[in-house]
Amino acid sequence: MTPQPDSVVLDAKGLRALAHPVRVQLVGLLRKHGPSTATRLAERLGVNSGTASYHLRQLGAAGLVEEDTERGNARERWWRSVHQRTWFNDHELVEREPEAALAYLQSVAATYTSRTQQALNELQTMPRVWRDTFDMSDWPLRLTPEEASALYEELRAVMSRYRQDTPGAAAQAPEGAERFSVITHLLPEPDAPATSTGTDTGTDAGTDTDAGVERP
């Protein structure tokens, strides 16, 4: 499967630029909410504006965000995301930049965790109709690598059948449609022993991020 037109395929420079949780979150906020300033983004993340401004400049140098010159002025710079998705599946790059690759994935994982906590905090104030769609589950499986890859492709096929959250799709969405995010974690555990009890460990909830990693 190939990257979509609005995706950025991470190279070494982009990978190193995103190897920080604040930068992953900044890109996510710009993708989710549109152009913004360092001050406003800093308020959302709970950091000072100087920190946000520094990280935005680093992201800009890597080509992941850019100044929105139509909005900016001499007093305040506006920033926007250059892409809507992040594509990272370069095995050779991982071997060349193992520390940056790990730091990036750890940053993404931290962002997912933060978004999960945010969703949980918002759950009680959600309308009941949306609260009933909230889910957080896990299924321990015993698969071969080939079966795991097939599962991944099946999950992607299911997601592709639904309306994506893009500006064009949002304009044509039916009444009542809201942003709804799905995060998948496929976690190999090759050294885990076989379970003997057959206990179902499933739970129920759901998450969201805009700094997602895709792989073909």
What spans do the regions from the language model cover?
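Short, cationic-aromatic polyanion-contact patches
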Residues: R16-V22, T37, E66-E92
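A short acidic, leucine-rich amphipathic alpha-helix
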Residues: R40-E43
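Helix-turn-helix DNA-binding motif, specifically the short coil turn and the N-cap/start of the second
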Residues: N48
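Glycine-centered, phosphate/nucleic-acid-interacting loop/turn motifs that mediate DNA/RNA or nucleotide
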Residues: G63
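Charged, low-complexity intrinsically disordered regulatory/assembly segments
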Residues: T125-P216
